[in-house]
Each structure stands twice: as C-alpha cells, then as structure tokens.
C-alpha cells in the first residue's frame, strides 16, 4: 500500500544534495506565486542516516537562499526501508540511537514526525520515536489516522504534539485527546481529493475546541498539488467550514502547526509582516473560485516580492 514512498526513496537516494535543493526551489517559487510565504518541509525519503541528513541539509540551503521561509522536520520514521523488511526493531533502533542524535547534533530540524499507521509504525513504536526526539530537543509531530484509527491522534494529545496530520478517520477519543493536549489538527484535503479518500471530521474538531489548520501535503506520491488556493476551496466544499474558519486554518492555525504563531499568521504589531493582497471583492470569492490564482501582490517580511 505504501510502495509510492519507497519508489520516491530510490529516486531521492540517487539525487545529489544540490539537485534536491534546485528542484525544491522551483516548487517554492510556485508556492510563492500562489501566496505561500512560509512552509514546512519534511525529510523521510532517504531512510538512512546519511540520506536523511542530506535532505535536511537541502532544506537548510532553501531557507538560506529562498524568499519563502522553510521550517525543517525530520521524518526518518516515514516508512520501513526495504533493507529492513522483517527487522523493524533494528530500524527503530537506528532511528533512536543514530539518526535522531545526528539530526540534533547538526541542529538542522525543529520537529520530529512519525507515520503512525497500519503497516508503518504502531502507536507504541511512534511513542518511543517521538519521546526520543523530544529528549534530543525535537518537538513531536505525527501523521495519524489516515487509513486506520490505531491510536495516533490519541497519542498526539498525550504527548502534546504540536500537530497531527491527515486525521481522515480520527475517532472521537482522538479529537478529545488533541483538544486536551493543545495539538493542532493539520488537515490535508488535497490529498484526500487526489487519492479519492474520505475527508477528516473538521466540524467535529472545531466544535471540540481543536485548532484546525490546513496544508497542501505537496509530495510526489499522494498529492502533486501545491496551490493553497485549491486547498482553501476544498476546505469550504468538503469540510463545510466557513470562509472565516478556512482563512484561520491556512494562516494563524497553520503558523501554530509549525510553532510560529507568534511571528506569522496574522497582521499584528511585532510580527514579520507577511501578507497577501488578493484580486477579489471579498473572502467568499476566494473560496468560490476554487483553484484560480487570485493573488495580486505578495509581501514578505514587509517587502514586496518581485
């Protein structure tokens, strides 16, 4: 079911660090044209210590070179590499005893993420990996409840994870746990759309007091879309959120999902001054014109982007 990840792993391993940086830079420029000024980038397509560090170094270069701010997340626990098939305990040891310490030593990631899902890492394994990451200064995040509700969203709340992604089949106990733990539910409607899957119970989350964010989940295997204006439209159409709720989800709550709500996500004194000027009569129109690029101007850190 997850052969797509391993296919991308093969391609990523064969690419140089500079090739990865250049390709990602093109994607960032396209994101910027649609109004994205900050994004999170995850590793997880190397699945060896050297290859994961290579991806994180590429992300670091992007942060130095590109107008878009890029926040790095280590996700060595994205899949079980083919060379560890039948020996998952050994790979988890590699993650906890070698990869995470190396990432922390080089200070090239802010977060540690795990794919907690049937066939990938179970809740107990995910807890061990995320707790190890926290011990080394990496804030926990989790991919949870995309296909089966195996306890990932509950774990997110218990650990106080900054965010939990996907949550398509998030159960009531997961919603309650995230509300108690202050975890942001980062929903990925374009992935649901592309895969023909269900959509997360966004309204139940909002009513329970869970902060809801939305992101593109741009990746080679399950979501080739990086247009956040398409994501905005899906938020209204599929989650039945109001335009105001969707705006909050892709701005302030999105910033909270990467620990930056004190710097970006709203126009306030003391923040960085990132904003988008729209060619639209009102907010409803942006949601209505799903997928269209209505960006008129992008301002990054108080300066107009050419």
What residue spans do the PLM features occupy?
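Metal-coordinating catalytic core of metallo-dependent amide/deamination hydrolases
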Residues: 6-25, 29, 37-150
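Active-site-adjacent C-terminal substructures of enzyme catalytic domains
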Residues: 139, 149-266, 278-282, 290, ...
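Loop/turn positions that initiate beta-strands
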Residues: 270-273
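Short aromatic-centered micro-motifs
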Residues: 298
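Anion (oxyanion) recognition and catalysis
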Residues: 32, 64, 134, 179, ...
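Flexible glycine-/small-residue-enriched beta->alpha junction loops
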Residues: 1-5
